[in-house]
């Protein structure tokens, strides 16, 4: 299922040397700075390595975050701010704002920006894995797991770490509530797509599939509405993707709800539900075409070309024809003018974000070593402090090569 998911670009960043000449006045302090520089560069390389696994990325990110916390957590036995928190300047782009970077001299800004990229990597890993030919059950579980991990990272950043920033996020930037909320909800919705595909593959109860599809459609609608007040120039393409997914899963919900109604001998209502499914599916097809033509940040998904998308159209058509035949021979029910309300609540299969925790502080960052960082000796960046509007070269991400579509998203 290559090109099933829309993905915004990774955040780009300027190099950071951590050369605290004069301030780092001991070999142990200098080693922390050198290790920070090396760990950061290694982690950034992981983001663009198509062979990188979740375990490898976690090991690399844990190494960096364990060291970086030595610039954030109090290490002098008091509750006062870490004296190193504001000593180094960091520059990051945003996923919707092109190559113009934001700059803050704050280690917490670095923490949330890098962790944001880690979450983005998990969504991209899930997308690549879902695009494999003949994906296995274990790989499907990895897709599901990765999307929940991403949602958990975004959620923890929003609730715990972003509020600590001295300088609040500007409108339209990744760290402001509307943008990060959308990433949280989209990751959850896509994880539930895995569950739906699995439920269909195993021929689970139609009512369960309908409820899951309805909940997933509502997630996509919520994500779309969250972006309503964002600048259309940077958000319209993303919104169109969320809208097409919403209508696609509403079509699923009405289709499988129709099957449930037919099984309960409510043939007239089943027909009306299937007609509504046809309407939602047609709208999803139109939105797919509009999405493909839109310009904006991110890769362009091609859901309408996938067998998973096309199969739903055939299922709706065949089920509706079956209902109409049964109604003509057996039930003779009147078809209601209004579609049956989808008052569905999924009891199983809902994707909750996986809790995200930072690794423990590195053993290198002791109070004794911390005391050898001497701010009175002054510090100047080895380059002039960044201007907020400085352009940074975008991240060159690995190409997503199309593979033969088996018609099964993740199962």
Swiss-Prot record:
Keyword terms: Lipoprotein, Membrane, Methylation, Prenylation
Membrane topology, record value: Lipid-anchor
GO cellular component, one term: membrane
Annotated spans, Disordered: 379-411
Primary localization: membrane
All residue ranges annotated as the BRO1 domain in the record: 84-403
Prosegment residue ranges: 409-411
S-farnesyl cysteine lipid sites: 408
Cell compartments where the protein resides: Membrane
InterPro entries: BRO1_dom, BRO1_sf, BROX
Superkingdom: Eukaryota
Pfam families found in the cross-reference section: BRO1 (PF03097)
Sites bearing Cysteine methyl ester, chain numbering: 408
Comp. bias regions, Basic and acidic residues: 379-404
Family the entry assigns: Belongs to the BROX family.
The protein's name in its UniProt record: BRO1 domain-containing protein BROX
Species per Swiss-Prot/TrEMBL record: Danio rerio (Zebrafish)
């Amino acid at each position: 299922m290559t090109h099933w998911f829309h993905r915004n670009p990774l955040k780009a960043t300027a190099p950071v040397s951590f050369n605290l000449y004069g301030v780092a006045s001991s070999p142990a302090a200098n080693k922390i700075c050198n290790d920070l520089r090396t760990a950061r560069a290694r982690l950034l390389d992981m983001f663009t390595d198509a062979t990188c696994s979740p375990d490898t990325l976690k090991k690399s990110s844990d190494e960096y975050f364990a060291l970086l916390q030595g610039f954030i957590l109090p290490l002098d036995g008091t509750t006062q701010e870490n004296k190193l928190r504001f000593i180094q300047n960091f520059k990051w782009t945003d996923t919707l704002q092109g190559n113009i970077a934001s700059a803050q001299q704050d280690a917490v800004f670095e923490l949330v920006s890098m962790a944001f990229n880690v979450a983005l990597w998990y969504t991209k890993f899930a997308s690549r894995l879902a695009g494999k030919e003949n994906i296995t059950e274990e790989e499907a579980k990895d897709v599901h797991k990765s999307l929940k991990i991403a949602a958990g990272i975004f959620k923890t950043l929003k609730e715990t770490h972003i509020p600590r920033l001295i300088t609040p996020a500007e409108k339209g930037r990744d760290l402001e509530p509307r943008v990060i909320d959308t990433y949280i909800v989209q990751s959850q919705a896509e994880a539930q797509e895995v569950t739906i595909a699995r439920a269909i593959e195993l021929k689970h109860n139609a009512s369960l599939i309908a409820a899951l599809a309805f909940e997933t459609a509502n997630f996509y609608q919520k994500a779309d509405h969250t972006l309503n007040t964002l600048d259309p120039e940077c958000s319209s393409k993303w919104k169109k993707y969320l809208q097409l997914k919403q209508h696609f899963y509403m079509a699923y919900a009405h289709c499988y709800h129709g099957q449930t109604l037919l099984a309960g001998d409510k043939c007239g209502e089943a027909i009306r539900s299937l007609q509504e499914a046809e309407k939602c599916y047609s709208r999803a097809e139109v939105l797919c075409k509009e999405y493909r033509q839109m310009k904006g940040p991110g890769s362009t998904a091609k859901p309408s070309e996938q067998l998973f998308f096309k199969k739903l159209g055939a299922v709706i058509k065949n089920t509706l024809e079956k209902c109409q035949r049964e109604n003509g021979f057996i039930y003779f029910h009147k078809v209601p003018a209004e579609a049956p309300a989808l008052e569905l609540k999924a009891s199983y299969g809902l994707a909750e974000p996986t809790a995200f925790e930072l690794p423990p502080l590195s053993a290198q960052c002791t109070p004794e070593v911390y005391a050898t960082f001497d701010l009175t000796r002054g510090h100047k960046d080895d380059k002039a402090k960044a201007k907020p509007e400085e352009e940074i070269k975008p991240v060159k991400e690995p190409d997503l090569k199309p593979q033969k579509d088996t018609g099964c998203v993740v199962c």
